[in-house]
Design a protein with these regions (language model features):
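A short, acidic, amphipathic alpha-helical segment used as a generic capping/interface helix at domain edges
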Residues: 283-291, 313-337
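Active-site loop segments of alpha/beta catalytic cores
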Residues: 164, 179, 185-283
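Short, well-ordered coil/turn segments that N-cap beta-strands
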Residues: 86-88, 157-162, 210-214, 249-253, ...
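Alpha/beta catalytic barrel-like cores
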Residues: 27, 33-183, 297, 325-333, ...
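Active-site-proximal beta-alpha loop/turn segments in soluble metabolic enzymes
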Residues: 172-186, 217-233, 302-311, 345-354
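Aromatic- and acid-rich polysaccharide-binding/catalytic face
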Residues: 263-289, 293-309
Length: 385
């Protein structure tokens, strides 16, 4: 079987996007390996999974969280997730409870050469760089995720779908370089540990909750550096690294682009769901969003602001989102897909808010998602009339 060179420096968006993911996943599911030129890593052989509930995972009217919540009590955080985003609950991350549960520390702890201190800082033992990552959940680093999984275990009925998230290789690579690793080693190890966590979490959910679909997001706040020309590695290398992380997953995947991050790079890596802030800056990427929707992709609209007061009503965020949709439609996006192929989330994590504020932001997102679901039902009735 011949594959187009998806790692070629001149590969365009049509190759580097959804086509890339189809190729990568077909390679993996065939039980073969392919070495990626930019970082010299091999996508490992993984077992072929039987068809599950994932094909019907995404439906109009879903809301979820980005990840972080302000709570110190993991059970309380999980209760908020289950109550405010019941159709797509998310595993909370609790950095205020412990710096070890910060978005860098909780994932790099799987690297044998990394020591995470109580304050979340990293130190490197370079003699252990050649050792494989060993992902394992522990109460110090993953209290929110462990409490979430326990709540699902004891629930009388599991949700149809859940969302988990892992910090991506670009963001982890920058952190590892700052901790003292050479750039090439830092990003190579970041890719290895991100892929290891993706496989570990998916296998865990599949084994424990086989009837529950998984949406697995890769969080990449560092994408803002590529948007503003401050990239630590080349664009094509970054696409290779992020695409390789997505490719080891058999579940539905997403990439969260925080704030003014590079949505074009995220799209080029080929996620099923593209998470962006629902602001006027999204109009600069209208062509990318159009291609993503045309390829049957979904968008997670970060429509509830996290950098200013939300207000008591859904009306303000809803009007802003509808206005954005209208302008995107004028710029070529399909008017039905732009409304119905979307989730609603807060713009970013909620760890910096009070507990009541965080719950309120999730509640606003849920009410907005309900409106999208109602519109989708109305559209189907109109078509069938």
């Amino acid at each position: 079987m011949e594959y187009p060179d998806i790692c070629a420096p001149n590969a365009g968006p049509d190759v580097m996007g959804s086509v890339a993911q189809r190729i990568l996943r077909s390679v993996i599911r065939a039980g073969t390996s392919r070495r990626f030129r930019s970082f010299g890593y091999v996508v490992p052989r993984v077992p072929v999974m039987s068809p599950g509930p994932h094909s019907a995972l995404l439906v109009p009217g879903l809301s979820t969280g980005i990840g972080s919540l302000p709570h110190l009590d993991p059970e309380a955080a999980v209760s908020v997730s289950l109550a405010e985003t019941p159709r797509l609950p998310f595993a909370p991350q609790l950095p205020n409870r412990s710096p070890r549960e910060g978005m860098i520390a909780e994932w790099v702890v799987a690297l044998p050469e990394v020591e995470v201190a109580d304050d979340g800082s990293l130190s490197i033992d370079s003699s252990r760089i050649g050792e494989a990552p060993t992902p394992s959940l522990n109460p110090d680093s993953h209290s929110g995720l462990l409490a979430f999984l326990e709540a699902l275990r004891v629930a009388p009925e599991n949700p149809k779908r859940i969302k988990l998230q892992v910090t991506g290789p670009l963001t982890l690579g920058i952190a590892l370089e700052a901790a003292g690793l050479p750039s090439d080693v830092a990003f190579r190890r970041a890719g290895e540990v991100s892929r290891a966590w993706v496989q570990h979490l998916e296998a865990l959910v599949t084994a424990r909750f086989p009837a529950t679909g998984l949406l697995l997001f890769i969080d990449e706040p560092a994408l803002v550096r590529w948007r503003h020309g401050d990239e630590p590695i080349g664009r094509d290398e970054a696409i290779d690294l992020l695409s390789g992380t997505l490719a080891v997953a058999n579940c539905i995947t997403g990439v969260h682009v925080c704030g003014d991050g590079d949505a074009r790079l995220a799209h080029a890596a080929g996620p099923d769901v593209l998470g962006i802030t629902a602001s006027d800056s999204a109009l600069e990427d209208a062509d990318v969003l159009m291609r993503h929707l045309e390829a049957d992709g979904w968008i997670a609209w970060g429509a509830v602001p996290t950098d200013r007061p939300v207000g008591d009503s859904t009306e303000g965020p809803w009007r802003r989102l509808v206005g954005l949709w209208c302008e995107l439609t004028r710029r070529g996006c399909d008017p039905v897909r732009v409304r119905t192929h979307g989730l609603v989330t807060p713009a970013c994590g909620l760890a910096g808010h009070g507990e009541a504020q965080a719950a309120h932001a999730l509640h606003i997102a849920s009410e907005m998602a309900d409106r999208i679901g109602d519109q989708a039902v109305a559209a189907r009735l109109t078509v069938g009339a």
